[in-house]
Amino acid sequence: MIVNKQTFSEISVPTYILEEEALRRNLTLISHVAKESGAEIILAFKAYALWKTFPIFRDYISSTTASSLNEARLGFEEFGAPTHTYSPAYLDSEIEAVARCSSHLTFNSLTQFERLHVAALSANSNLSIGLRVNPEYSEVGTELYNPCAPGSRFGVTSIKLPDVLPSAIEGFHCHCHCESGADVFERTLVHIEEKFSRWFPQLKWINFGGGHLMTRKGYDVLHLINIIKGFRMRYPHLKVILEPGSAFGWQTGPLVSQVVDVVEDRGIRTAILDVSFT
């Protein structure tokens, strides 16, 4: 990228610059994947929540995903549509407010479901309830960030599910990826089906979470489309949902900062910026 200093001359504090053309390019690709595959693709606020760009997003997608009450409010009040909401744990004092801002609400455990789903449905009778499941497989390399590592706090493993799900549970939510390719999704899907397909006839939808970095250069978009189409052919009654975050904002502009000092030690010169070193 060639930087024109004059472009940033009036910026005095660290600033992310969003390039609308680049953003729309990502949105166009994501919209294409959704149309061709038949999946619903929604925006994850965990990775992207620049609410002033929501009018642009509404030209391409219809919903968002939240992980807290404030994120659910952001989607409901600023994006203009109820959210798909998941949290590792909901507070009793917030569950009704979360439900009123949501179209889908996913519980992390059966105990949370049992304790709170009645209150959630009382607050919003149109709510679709889901359960996060853990296929015990993920190719995320760093254990700290692996949602399916042994002892993970995320989701219910197959051995803990009853043969017949509670009637209020309409969907499963899986999140196993981080900036992953379509090949990783394909391999992960084998494990998801192996562990959980016997419950699929009882469901209406399945959410394959985020981490699908489909806007990255070299990503096999056609392969992703074919994977989803193949899954939908095997389970035509299931609505498929993906909720990437980084894919929407991927390489849509620079972070502008300033060098405020240069230090040297043992021949190594280091520029000190007015942004985090990491």
What is each stretch, according to the model?
Residues 4, 32-33, 92-96:
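Short, flexible, solvent-exposed loop/turn segments with mixed acidic/basic and small polar residues
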Residues 1-18:
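Generic N-terminal amphipathic, Lys/Arg-enriched alpha-helix
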Residues 3, 25-29, 35, 40-48:
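N-terminal glycine-rich anion-binding loops that anchor highly charged ligand groups
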Residues 7-11, 170-175, 209-210:
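A short small-residue
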Residues 180-278:
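C-terminal active-site-proximal or functional interface alpha/beta core segments in diverse enzymes
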Residues 39-205, 227-230, 234:
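Active-site-proximal beta-alpha core segment in soluble small-molecule metabolic enzymes
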